[in-house]
Regions:
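Catalytic pocket-lining loop regions of alpha/beta-barrel enzymes
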Residues: 153-271, 314, 320-325
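Short aromatic-enriched loop/helix-cap "lid" or pocket-rim segments at secondary-structure transitions
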Residues: 54-59, 102, 130-131, 210-212, ...
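Short, small-residue-enriched loops and turns at beta-alpha junctions
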Residues: 96-97, 124-125, 150-154, 205-208, ...
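Mid-to-C-terminal alpha-helical segments outside catalytic/metal-binding sites
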Residues: 3-6, 13-28, 35-46, 67-88, ...
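Residue-level preference for long, well-ordered alpha-helices that form the structural scaffold
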Residues: 66-70, 100, 155, 212, ...
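Short helix-capping segments at alpha-helix termini
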Residues: 110-113, 139, 191-196, 226-227, ...
Length: 326
């Protein structure tokens, strides 16, 4: 494994295990193949949701009465048992309330662990331009997330001005949707080559022992031809959850799908994200981390560093903050 320009130090298997003991306790990861990864590995979780139903405004999601309906803040993520310590996060919107964008920015103000926020604004509304100007004034506001249905609608109507405004404002666009999403984004990327686009959750493909469906595989390949599209490897365990049963923990089960993503996007445009706390409905945080990091480690070179932080730096231009790593 070659050295990085970040000056990351490398260590042998014994030192890695010793240095990771806090995160490994109780998770059964001490014999991980990824035990030779760098000591100073910077891990930016680029897909977390934070919210507080106790606020006077309440929250539109998650629904009351569910296990997710509770206060979830960055300190709760940091307290989790992790395969390797997360060193920062990019928060993704969890609310349709406009002022919840500001609430997240207010939380981030005094917490250097938060290196970026992907908010929620509504393109194709008369307020959109002023809202982008307002929130983009804060350097921690790194983009917005929309649905693939909205993107498809804007493409059909040929009204892409608001999305171009994002590119002109140096903001990224996260897109969430089903397995048809990669093909939709391939069309968008050609129309707006200066817009940095991030496919969420590898397109929410259903992960089964039967292997990747052809339409999704072809969509991923089409999307990856556009250098302004990145793929977030997030919500992986949710994609394998069926009928209330916990998904497999073995990398082998997910490998065919990860192969499609990596073969298409290469090591330069894949991004780590968890989708926590939603992911906890399917698997423990340490488990989902191990699956994808074992895979990235096998690729050798500086793939781990690219996957865990550097690619996200290109996609989001997340903000380095004093005190982030203690």
């Amino acid at each position: 494994m070659k050295a990085l320009d970040l000056g990351v130090l490398f260590m042998n298997r014994r030192n890695w295990i010793a240095g990771s003991i806090t995160g490994l306790v109780g998770l059964g990861h001490a014999n991980s193949k990824a035990s030779s990864a760098p000591l100073g590995l910077d891990i930016i979780d680029c897909h977390t949701h934070f919210y507080d139903p106790m606020r006077p405004e309440g929250i539109p999601w998650p629904e009351k009465g569910t296990s997710l309906y509770r206060t979830v803040l960055p300190k709760d993520l940091r307290a989790l048992k992790q395969f390797r310590p997360v060193t920062g996060t990019v928060i993704v919107e969890a609310s349709s309330h406009l002022e919840d964008n500001q609430w997240l920015l207010d939380i981030a103000k005094d917490d250097p662990f938060i290196v970026g926020i992907v908010g929620r604004l509504e393109p194709a509304t008369k307020e959109f331009g002023n809202q982008v100007k307002r929130f983009a004034a804060n350097p921690l506001f790194r983009g917005i997330r929309v649905s693939s249905d909205l993107v498809a609608d804007l493409l059909e109507k040929g009204t892409l001005g608001d999305l171009k405004l994002l590119a002109d404002s140096d903001l990224a666009l996260d897109v969430n949707g089903g397995p048809e999403t990669p093909a939709i984004l391939a069309k968008l990327a050609k129309k707006l080559p200066s817009l940095r686009i991030v496919l969420n959750h590898i397109g929410n493909v259903r992960i089964t022992s039967e292997g990747p469906p052809l339409a999704w595989r072809e969509g991923i390949q089409k999307a990856a031809l556009n250098k302004n599209i990145f793929c977030k490897v997030s919500a992986l365990v949710e994609g394998a959850t069926r009928d209330g049963k916990r998904p497999p923990k073995d990398l082998a089960f997910y490998r065919p799908y990860l192969n499609v993503v990596w073969n298409a996007f290469g090591y330069e445009r894949v991004i780590y994200g968890s989708n926590w706390p939603v992911s906890e409905l399917a698997a423990a945080y340490g488990t989902l981390q191990q699956i994808v990091m074992e895979y990235a480690f096998e690729k050798g070179g500086n793939t781990m560093e690219r996957f865990c932080s550097l690619n996200a730096k290109q996609a989001y231009k997340w903000v380095e903050r004093p005190g982030r790593r203690g």
